[in-house]
From Swiss-Prot:
Similarity comment text for this entry: Belongs to the bacterial ribosomal protein bL32 family.
Region (Disordered): 1-62
Pfam annotation, one family: Ribosomal_L32p
Superkingdom per UniProt: Bacteria
NCBIfam families: rpmF_bact
InterPro entries for the chain: Ribosomal_bL32 (IPR002677), Ribosomal_bL32_bact (IPR044957), Ribosomal_zn-bd (IPR011332)
Keyword Ribosomal protein (UniProt): yes
Keywords annotated in UniProt: Ribonucleoprotein, Ribosomal protein
Family annotation (HAMAP family): Ribosomal_bL32
GO term, biological process aspect, one: translation
Native source species: Methylocella silvestris (strain DSM 15510 / CIP 108128 / LMG 27833 / NCIMB 13906 / BL2)
Protein name (Swiss-Prot/TrEMBL): Large ribosomal subunit protein bL32
Length: 62
């Protein structure tokens, strides 16, 4: 059975756990619509990405 030869120090344990942190998603304000969207993602309300129409927006008539 494999057993560690030395106790893992708190510093080494912290270095290992530093990759486990969860980051909150970042949002940017869209220049055209003013809506919040993820960077490098298509604006789902307008269908625009980098100034080009990529998707046709769905019109919600309720």
């Amino acid at each position: 059975m494999a057993v560690p030869k030395r106790k893992t120090s708190p510093m080494k344990r912290g270095f290992r756990r530093s990759a486990d942190a969860l980051a909150a998603p970042t949002y940017v304000e869209d220049k055209d619509s003013g809506e919040l969207r993820r960077p490098h993602h298509v604006d789902l309300k307008t269908g625009m990405y980098r100034g080009r129409q990529i998707l046709t927006p769905k019109n919600k008539e309720a």
